[in-house]
């Protein structure tokens, strides 16, 4: 038998697409983010994104907005999806932002890729 893992896995795939829902769009960009045992993946700020997710308890709706960001009221919807495992629990998340600026302001680093 395989040895027991010393940590619960945290491995995610994040995508961004233009549109109001993931079902109605194709991903424009995708990154991987692994947070255990250490921050790795193709996410450009893996360390910061993992730290931010840990502070939020893996709850994407609880991520803190980036400070001091001003965005236009332009409506060009961007949808973010997250699928994978966070601390051993499967998760699937989808959120639509009014535009790219609002998406980037939705977290300090998690959605900035």
From Swiss-Prot:
Subcellular location per the Swiss-Prot or TrEMBL entry: Secreted
GO molecular function, one term: serine-type endopeptidase inhibitor activity
Keywords assigned by UniProt, alphabetized: Disulfide bond, Protease inhibitor, Secreted, Serine protease inhibitor
Cysteine pairings via disulfide bonds: 35-50, 71-101
Pfam families: SSI
Record-level GO cellular component terms: extracellular region
Source taxon at top rank: Bacteria
Residue(s) at site: Reactive bond: 73-74
Keyword Disulfide bond: yes
Classification via SUPFAM superfamilies: Subtilisin inhibitor
Predominant place of localization: secreted
Family classification: Belongs to the protease inhibitor I16 (SSI) family.
HAMAP family listed in its UniProt record: SSI
Subunit relationships: Homodimer.
Function according to Swiss-Prot or TrEMBL: Inhibitor of subtilisin BPN' and trypsin.
Protein name as annotated: Subtilisin inhibitor-like protein 2
């Amino acid at each position: 038998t395989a040895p027991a893992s010393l940590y619960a896995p945290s491995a995610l795939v994040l995508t961004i697409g233009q549109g109001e829902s993931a079902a109605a769009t194709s991903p424009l960009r995708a990154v991987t983010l692994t947070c255990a045992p250490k921050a790795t993946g193709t996410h450009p700020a893996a360390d910061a994104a993992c730290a931010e997710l840990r502070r939020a308890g893996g709850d994407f709706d609880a991520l803190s907005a980036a400070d001091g960001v001003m965005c236009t009221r332009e409506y060009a919807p961007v949808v973010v999806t997250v699928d994978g495992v966070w601390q051993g629990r499967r998760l699937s998340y989808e959120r639509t932002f009014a535009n790219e600026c609002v998406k980037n302001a939705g977290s300090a680093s998690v959605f900035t890729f």
